Amino acid sequence: MQEIEQRIYLAATYDTKGEEAEYLRQLLRRDGVMVVTVDVATSGQGSPAMVSAQEVAACHPQGAQAVFTGERGSAIVAMALAFERYLAGQRDVGAVLGIGGSGGTALVTPAMRALPVGVPKLMVSTMASGNVAPYVGPSDIAMMYSVTDVAGLNRISRRVLANAAGAIAGAFRQARQPIADDGRPAVGITMFGVTTPCVQHVTAALHDRYDCLVFHATGTGGQSMEKLADSRLLAGVLDLTTTEVCDFLFGGVLACTDDRFGAIARSGVPYVGSCGALDMVNFGALDTVPAACRERLLYPHNPQVTLMRTTAQENARQGAWIAERLNRCEGQVRFLIPEGGVSALDAPGQAFHDEAADAALFQALYDHVRQTDKRRLVRVPCHINDPLFARAAVEQFHEISQ
């Protein structure tokens, strides 16, 4: 089969960003790479782009009429879906470059997020100096701040856009080069600062046989791991730090989504999980903690991070929530119960040590997980950071991944 020549797809709303898009196209062509320009404007006006907005809009499940509504908000959402569907149907996508303000960034980045990890993605945006999590999500999108508004060419925007063209061209070429692969299958592992000793012991034990990919459980960290599981890029998962559930249920800032554990169910990947850092909800600096939580047990992890201890009632709730999702998993599942504590702070003499709260979590798991030959809870009579716990996790993983 003849290899398909890869191209850089350049997406912009040509009715407002056409001058900048054509400037980028010229730079990329001068650099010797093939470019496909795509108009994702919702105005319906004509443009010199190689792929018209009408062609993209036609990829919406309800057709182009769902995009060209004349209402900006709904039109952006609809065109974002249409562009995602359009891009997914192209077999020659070697990289994607987008430019835009808030609307254009919201329009282009969903299609970028849907692409596999490793396909270069660069978004030049006026929004890149703020909170970019809603745009980047669990993907490897690179965000470049435009400095000036994306509203015509000037001495600043020319330089920034030229740098963007050089960056995406370089990444495009690099992505086509083979990367050394020692043949070890990849496993995903979740970690937090307070479960670091556990994960260090686990990775040391697995390193010779597996390529250990460690994800910081910051909300997007868990999503990134599950994206790889959904893409069938992981041979197994050791989800030892499920703390993102606390933040999702109780208003923290490092929350997962309602789809946490969904990729495990969909992929059937061998899964070893545990209760790592389910004793804490994350907030920002102390003065950002919600007023309703100010009288709770708080711990200043550092000047930017304040932790709140979960109560027995909250632990019972999150135990049931996790159990409900584990029950959807039909592959091999082992969920380990560290009876001696779930984090570095949840140990005798430490700030969050609370045996009653932990017991409520563990009991909720036992009450709600439907155990089968494939889906089991495993008691481990030690602290999560004890080397014995790591050994138990590795043994369980070896057992289910043979």
Curated annotation (Swiss-Prot):
InterPro entries reported for this sequence: Tobamovirus_resist_UPF0261, UPF0261, UPF0261_C, UPF0261_N
Pfam family for this entry, one: UPF0261
CDD domains in UniProt: Tm-1-like
Superkingdom of the source species: Bacteria
Family, per entry: Belongs to the UPF0261 family.
HAMAP family, per the entry: UPF0261
Name of the protein: UPF0261 protein BP1203
